Amino acid sequence: MFYPIHFDVIVVGGGHAGTEAALASARMQCNTLLITHNIDTLGQMSCNPAVGGIGKGHLVKEIDAMGGSMAYAIDQSGIQFRVLNSSKGAAVRATRAQADKILYRQAIRSILEYQKFLLVIQASVEDLIVSGNKIVGVITPKLGMKFSGTSVVLTTGTFLNGKIHIGMNNFRGGRSGDSESSSLLSERLKELSFQISRLKTGTSPRVHTKGINFGSLRAQYSDDPIPVFSFIGSTKLHPTQVPCYITHTNNKTHEIVRSNLYQSPMYTGLIKGIAPRYCPSIEDKITRFSDRNAHQIFLEPEGLTTPEVYLNGISTSLPFCVQMQMIKSIQGLENACIIRPGYAIEYDFFDPRDLKLTLESKIISGLFFSGQINGTTGYEEAAAQGLLAGINAARFSKNKEGWYPRRDQAYLGVLVDDLCTHGTEEPYRMFTSRAEYRLSLREDNADLRLTEIARQLGLIDESRWKAFCCKKENIEKERQRLRNTYIFPYSSDVAQLNNFLKTPLTHETNGEDLLRRPEINYKKLSQLSTFSPSILDRQVFEQIEIQIKYEGYIRHQQEEIKRHIYNENTLLPTDIDFNIVSGLSQEVIDKLNNYKPYSIGQASRISGITPAAISNLLVWLKKQGLLEHNTC
């Protein structure tokens, strides 16, 4: 039986990818259905209770700049906020927040339930309805219902044929304590010619606070002033702030782990999936870094109303009894009791090279993939993909062309280009080092890069748009004021200025030129009567300071970006057989026919595609009269 309503967009899965996908589609006024196996776990933090970090925080800011909900939800639920790399350059500074996982889940659910054009139904999708090579709906056998939709977004997380391992014991599941995972959807996708592989991730044990000796641990508090994640957020939204704590493993811990590797499913061959390189288990740490005598552990409270503490840094799939021994060997945890054991989980994912940069399948029209199903790891990577998939599923339902950001526009652009061009053989996570234009892709300017685009896409409401325009206007007005305001060697406050300078002022200088000096910042400048009154909005004055201090470097990078955009906008025919292009080696032809790059830029990033091959492609395009550029 078919549900009586036809949906523009159907989103399968209520994790971080699914919630952002559904919200994006609904904000674009598409009739949207979100199907989740459990409404009570919408926005659940399955692993560590935190949002952000290096590279990841940049993605969260971009999601927020485009009207997404992750940043605003963490502002309502964050119990410790810090800026990582705060002493380094602006490009690599990253916000991170410890979450009250209960408050976070409540915030996400509230946003979903009050979103217009969105219906949430609790059910399990186990099959797709496909007509020819086009998606037309989904099937929920246990509900006995079929749902028709113009487009479908799959955000299945680790629930796609998931298997949980604790020691030699394993069982079907996508998350410990949740319902069983299903292999039926995986099998259906395999029938449709999708390339399937296995990945592995893991989680750390949770312990009870009453057994922790906090007095022997180092506390780590929120920064002062406390950071805010959302561009429309405020510290007034933050709940009570509490510290995290730091301890370390030791030789005794390592010996316990080493002597029990024979009981580790990773080291006995039970687990076939590839683990994340940048989030290794404690078994991997001790094996790969055998010269280390200690590994850092962060004790992260899971909330203000729960006694659970997440032990970040010792992800493990060792037997429960071994985990207990291991925990009790660590300083401060000698009397700690495990509430939930750590575990490893294997799950299916599909080759993201079978996707367009819009995250639409190249195989089935109207079918979109986002999150861990594409081989990524992390809440932030999933949420960013969900946003993009939701945008494009909505545009597909309206017969509009898809949209995606370039590598020079957003970390999201880097993420999807990496996945769709190179694929991945291990869980992919974002780092600032993956972005060649990271000086232009800072956290602080995510809204300046993306909010206008999001407004055009229909994601930004009127109140948010007015706030953005006001901020942008204030930045320009203040820069203009600083540019036109001069201080002289004989000014009344020059002595105060000279206290800040390495060498005394000898000639008239305006505010912008003073800010270019490394020893001067906006706060110091605003102490001088010449440059009063100053802007109080932190977002505004920090943006002004960064723009001025990095102006020369940014200008140089913009020249590089212009060349990059030319190649990205030089399009290749979608139906081309590269055998007809003369001068290409067979290896190059095979790779180009396999990848089907959309542009010269994407072709140039495929491993083994030489500069000579790119030149041949450009010559061929010119001869065929196909040397056209996408002006989007």
From Swiss-Prot:
Binding site for FAD: G13, G14, G15, H16, A17, G18, V125, S182, Q372
Entry binding sites for NAD(+): 275-289
Major localization listed first in the record, in broad terms: cytoplasm
GO biological process, one term: tRNA methylation
Cofactor field: FAD
Molecular function in Gene Ontology: flavin adenine dinucleotide binding
Keyword NAD attached: yes
Keywords assigned: Cytoplasm, FAD, Flavoprotein, NAD, tRNA processing
One Pfam family it belongs to: SAM_GIDA_C
Protein's cellular compartments: Cytoplasm
GO CC terms, sorted: cytosol
Function: NAD-binding protein involved in the addition of a carboxymethylaminomethyl (cmnm) group at the wobble position (U34) of certain tRNAs, forming tRNA-cmnm(5)s(2)U34.
Subunit structure, interactors included: Homodimer. Heterotetramer of two MnmE and two MnmG subunits.
Family to which this protein belongs: Belongs to the MnmG family.
Name by which UniProt lists this protein: tRNA uridine 5-carboxymethylaminomethyl modification enzyme MnmG
Species of provenance: Blochmanniella pennsylvanica (strain BPEN)
The gene coding this protein: mnmG
